[in-house]
Amino acid sequence: MGPAYAAIMRPINEATWNRAERLRQGRDALKKLFSVYSRRELVEMKSKRFTVPGVAAPITKEQALGVLLNSGNASNLQRLMSGQKLTRDQVQAIIDTLDERDVRFAQSVWDYFETFRKESFDLEESLTGVRPEAVKAQPVQTRFGMLRGGYYPVAYDTDLSALPADQDKVGTQTSGR
């Protein structure tokens, strides 16, 4: 295998192996994070709805966890509250529905995302020449004590959740079809 292999194929093969290894590590880490829940609980988390005093529509545990995870920094909390038309009291009421295992899970998710900060910032800086500004964690009060908070990627729910503001979106997005 000559210079062409060394220049072309070796880097491709190494990148492919590195990608496969990173995917395996990520899968294992996520499996460990979610291992606090049974399969049945994970299924019910997405489908079983409950009411929260002061919140108009019933929600799922998955949505309640999303509220908690988005409360871990000021910018996500603001987006959550303005996008879903929730007050701080409603956010707190939703967080208060979660059990101790749920709040420990949320902190472990924030901690997991923190493990990528240096590498992702280094990559962004190498690609753009600008180092991203870190999102500052903000403490979150739960019934089981204060969580440190942390970064959680903002993702807009394309399935339109059942939180009150989404009821308006459903009407808006389906009225032109």
Set out the residue ranges of the language-model regions.
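Non-transmembrane, interaction-prone alpha-helical and coil segments associated with secretion
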Residues: 1-177
